[in-house]
Amino acid sequence: MSNNNIAFTFASSEVNKLGQNFIKITELCTGKLKLKSLYDQYLKENNPPENFWHDAIKKLELNIIPYFHSVENIPKTGRLIVVANHAFGVADGVTICSLISKVRQDYKLITHKVLRQAEAVKDKIIPLDFTSSKEAIHSNIKSRKHAEEVLLDDGVIVLFPAGAISTKKKIKT
Protein backbone atom coordinates (compact mmCIF):
# COMPACT_ATOMS: atom_id res chain seq x y z
CA MET A 1 0.00 0.00 0.00
CA SER A 2 2.10 2.93 1.18
CA ASN A 3 5.06 4.00 3.22
CA ASN A 4 4.52 3.50 6.93
CA ASN A 5 7.30 5.91 7.90
CA ILE A 6 4.93 8.80 8.39
CA ALA A 7 5.43 11.36 11.15
CA PHE A 8 2.78 9.99 13.48
CA THR A 9 2.63 13.09 15.66
CA PHE A 10 1.02 16.49 15.97
CA ALA A 11 4.09 17.88 17.73
CA SER A 12 5.70 19.08 14.51
CA SER A 13 3.12 21.87 14.27
CA GLU A 14 4.15 23.42 17.57
CA VAL A 15 6.68 26.20 17.23
CA ASN A 16 8.35 26.02 20.63
CA LYS A 17 10.19 23.06 22.15
CA LEU A 18 8.14 23.05 25.34
CA GLY A 19 4.92 22.68 23.33
CA GLN A 20 6.45 19.99 21.12
CA ASN A 21 7.64 17.99 24.12
CA PHE A 22 4.30 18.33 25.91
CA ILE A 23 2.45 17.03 22.84
CA LYS A 24 4.87 14.13 22.39
CA ILE A 25 4.47 13.07 26.03
CA THR A 26 0.69 13.40 25.82
CA GLU A 27 0.62 11.32 22.64
CA LEU A 28 2.70 8.58 24.25
CA CYS A 29 0.42 8.52 27.31
CA THR A 30 -2.79 8.42 25.28
CA GLY A 31 -2.23 5.60 22.82
CA LYS A 32 -0.01 6.85 20.00
CA LEU A 33 2.04 3.65 19.90
CA LYS A 34 -1.11 1.51 19.71
CA LEU A 35 -2.52 3.65 16.89
CA LYS A 36 0.79 3.47 15.01
CA SER A 37 0.84 -0.32 15.42
CA LEU A 38 -2.74 -0.63 14.12
CA TYR A 39 -1.92 1.62 11.16
CA ASP A 40 1.17 -0.45 10.32
CA GLN A 41 -0.98 -3.61 10.41
CA TYR A 42 -3.52 -1.93 8.13
CA LEU A 43 -0.80 -1.10 5.59
CA LYS A 44 0.39 -4.71 5.52
CA GLU A 45 -3.14 -5.90 4.74
CA ASN A 46 -3.18 -3.84 1.51
CA ASN A 47 -6.91 -3.12 1.75
CA PRO A 48 -8.68 -0.92 -0.81
CA PRO A 49 -8.40 2.77 0.19
CA GLU A 50 -12.14 3.34 -0.20
CA ASN A 51 -12.66 1.02 2.81
CA PHE A 52 -10.23 2.92 5.05
CA TRP A 53 -12.78 4.36 7.49
CA HIS A 54 -14.65 1.06 7.84
CA ASP A 55 -11.36 -0.81 8.28
CA ALA A 56 -10.30 1.73 10.93
CA ILE A 57 -13.49 1.09 12.91
CA LYS A 58 -12.72 -2.64 12.88
CA LYS A 59 -9.07 -2.12 13.84
CA LEU A 60 -10.00 0.24 16.66
CA GLU A 61 -12.70 -2.22 17.77
CA LEU A 62 -15.28 0.55 17.89
CA ASN A 63 -18.86 -0.48 18.54
CA ILE A 64 -20.80 2.16 16.64
CA ILE A 65 -24.45 2.54 17.53
CA PRO A 66 -25.81 5.20 15.16
CA TYR A 67 -28.38 7.58 16.57
CA PHE A 68 -31.72 6.62 15.06
CA HIS A 69 -31.30 6.33 11.30
CA SER A 70 -28.25 8.55 10.97
CA VAL A 71 -27.08 7.13 7.64
CA GLU A 72 -30.54 7.47 6.12
CA ASN A 73 -30.58 11.14 7.16
CA ILE A 74 -27.48 11.97 5.11
CA PRO A 75 -28.59 13.64 1.86
CA LYS A 76 -27.43 11.66 -1.19
CA THR A 77 -26.90 14.81 -3.25
CA GLY A 78 -26.40 18.52 -2.78
CA ARG A 79 -24.18 20.70 -0.64
CA LEU A 80 -23.64 19.52 2.89
CA ILE A 81 -21.50 20.80 5.76
CA VAL A 82 -21.04 18.43 8.68
CA VAL A 83 -19.79 20.14 11.84
CA ALA A 84 -19.15 17.82 14.76
CA ASN A 85 -17.62 17.89 18.18
CA HIS A 86 -14.84 15.36 18.66
CA ALA A 87 -14.74 14.62 22.34
CA PHE A 88 -13.33 11.15 21.67
CA GLY A 89 -10.64 12.29 19.26
CA VAL A 90 -9.80 9.96 16.43
CA ALA A 91 -12.82 7.74 17.12
CA ASP A 92 -15.22 10.58 16.30
CA GLY A 93 -13.52 11.47 13.05
CA VAL A 94 -13.33 7.85 11.91
CA THR A 95 -17.00 7.28 12.80
CA ILE A 96 -18.33 10.38 11.03
CA CYS A 97 -16.24 9.72 7.91
CA SER A 98 -17.35 6.08 7.87
CA LEU A 99 -21.02 7.10 8.02
CA ILE A 100 -20.63 9.79 5.36
CA SER A 101 -18.67 7.48 3.03
CA LYS A 102 -21.51 4.92 3.12
CA VAL A 103 -23.71 7.48 1.36
CA ARG A 104 -21.39 9.92 -0.42
CA GLN A 105 -17.98 9.81 -2.05
CA ASP A 106 -17.84 13.55 -2.78
CA TYR A 107 -16.78 14.45 0.76
CA LYS A 108 -13.67 16.21 2.04
CA LEU A 109 -12.48 16.39 5.62
CA ILE A 110 -10.92 19.64 6.82
CA THR A 111 -8.31 18.61 9.36
CA HIS A 112 -4.74 18.93 10.59
CA LYS A 113 -2.18 18.52 7.83
CA VAL A 114 -0.46 15.62 9.64
CA LEU A 115 -3.45 13.37 8.85
CA ARG A 116 -2.92 13.88 5.12
CA GLN A 117 0.10 11.58 5.34
CA ALA A 118 -2.18 8.53 5.31
CA GLU A 119 -2.13 7.63 1.62
CA ALA A 120 -5.54 5.90 1.72
CA VAL A 121 -7.34 9.13 2.62
CA LYS A 122 -4.97 11.75 1.24
CA ASP A 123 -7.42 12.78 -1.48
CA LYS A 124 -10.23 13.15 1.08
CA ILE A 125 -8.36 15.59 3.32
CA ILE A 126 -8.15 19.35 3.01
CA PRO A 127 -5.17 20.15 5.22
CA LEU A 128 -4.89 22.91 7.81
CA ASP A 129 -1.56 24.15 9.10
CA PHE A 130 -1.73 25.55 12.63
CA THR A 131 1.69 27.16 12.61
CA SER A 132 1.92 30.93 12.23
CA SER A 133 4.28 30.96 9.26
CA LYS A 134 3.53 32.79 6.02
CA GLU A 135 3.55 29.42 4.25
CA ALA A 136 0.89 28.17 6.66
CA ILE A 137 -1.30 31.19 6.01
CA HIS A 138 -1.02 30.71 2.24
CA SER A 139 -1.66 26.98 2.58
CA ASN A 140 -4.75 27.60 4.72
CA ILE A 141 -6.12 30.14 2.26
CA LYS A 142 -5.64 27.56 -0.50
CA SER A 143 -7.44 25.00 1.66
CA ARG A 144 -10.32 27.39 2.27
CA LYS A 145 -10.67 27.93 -1.48
CA HIS A 146 -10.60 24.16 -2.02
CA ALA A 147 -13.43 23.76 0.52
CA GLU A 148 -15.44 26.46 -1.27
CA GLU A 149 -14.96 24.60 -4.58
CA VAL A 150 -16.19 21.35 -3.02
CA LEU A 151 -19.34 23.09 -1.84
CA LEU A 152 -19.87 24.87 -5.16
CA ASP A 153 -19.71 21.41 -6.77
CA ASP A 154 -22.47 20.26 -4.36
CA GLY A 155 -20.04 18.17 -2.32
CA VAL A 156 -19.68 17.51 1.40
CA ILE A 157 -17.35 19.25 3.84
CA VAL A 158 -16.71 17.61 7.22
CA LEU A 159 -15.03 19.58 9.99
CA PHE A 160 -14.35 19.31 13.67
CA PRO A 161 -13.83 22.78 15.15
CA ALA A 162 -10.98 22.93 17.62
CA GLY A 163 -11.83 26.07 19.56
CA ALA A 164 -9.04 28.60 19.94
CA ILE A 165 -6.71 27.06 17.39
CA SER A 166 -9.33 27.25 14.66
CA THR A 167 -9.72 31.01 14.94
CA LYS A 168 -7.61 33.81 13.57
CA LYS A 169 -8.19 37.51 14.16
CA LYS A 170 -7.78 38.40 10.50
CA ILE A 171 -6.68 36.53 7.43
CA LYS A 172 -6.13 38.44 4.22
CA THR A 173 -7.09 36.67 1.02
Predicted feature residues:
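Membrane-anchoring hydrophobic helices of lipid-metabolizing enzymes
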Residues: 1-83, 93-95, 102-104, 122-123
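Soluble catalytic domains of membrane acyltransferases
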Residues: 63-173
